[in-house]
Regions:
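Conserved core of the PLP fold type I
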Residues: 57-158
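N-terminal small-domain helix-loop-helix segment of the aminotransferase-like
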Residues: 8-95, 103
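Short beta-strands and strand-loop turn motifs
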Residues: 3, 31-34, 138-140, 158
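Generic N-terminal amphipathic, Lys/Arg-enriched alpha-helix
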Residues: 1-9
Length: 158
């Protein structure tokens, strides 16, 4: 029996940013569509990575990230943001926000669920919401300070 893709695979679309990057490369242009970092790696980050490699720290972490990092994030949230969080149940460290958002959507959304999407938004979010068979509801923020009115919130979802 030949291998075939699932029906849900058709719901996953190339992001607009990636499409622009490919088109830019095709015509030999200058890519302004993607936020690719071109700054030097901070010395402490590189040294920390080397120390971890030398110490043999090269295996998968727990599904929710390194315990020490989750606790450091919880401390930062309390000290800097004034928000108490439980690093064991309220903080997850992922390899990136895109993958984390995709996992969260698949874990939390059922077909037909509505998701409030504030404009402007990262285009990939729409593809992820649609892949989870949910329905995006677009809510515009108001210039010049890009705020929203919670009084309008009743009309955001059914």
């Amino acid at each position: 029996m030949p291998l075939s893709l699932s029906k849900k695979s058709s719901l996953i679309a190339q992001s607009e940013i990636r499409a622009m990057t490919l088109e830019c490369a095709r015509v030999g242009g200058i890519n302004l569509a993607q936020g690719v970092c071109d700054t030097e790696l901070p010395l402490p980050v590189g040294q920390g990575a080397k120390e971890a490699i030398d110490a043999g720290i090269n295996s998968y972490t727990r599904y929710d990230g390194l315990k020490e990092l989750r606790y450091a994030i919880a401390n930062k949230m309390k000290d800097y943001n004034g928000i108490d969080t439980d690093p064991e149940s309220e903080i997850i460290v992922s390899a990136g926000s895109t993958g984390a958002f995709y996992c969260a959507c698949l874990a939390l959304l059922n077909p037909g669920d509505e998701v409030i999407l504030f404009e402007p938004y990262y285009g990939y979010l729409i593809n992820t919401i649609l892949a989870a068979e949910a329905v995006p509801t677009y809510v515009g923020l108001k210039a010049p300070d890009w705020t929203l009115s919670m009084r309008r919130g009743k009309g955001w979802v059914n």
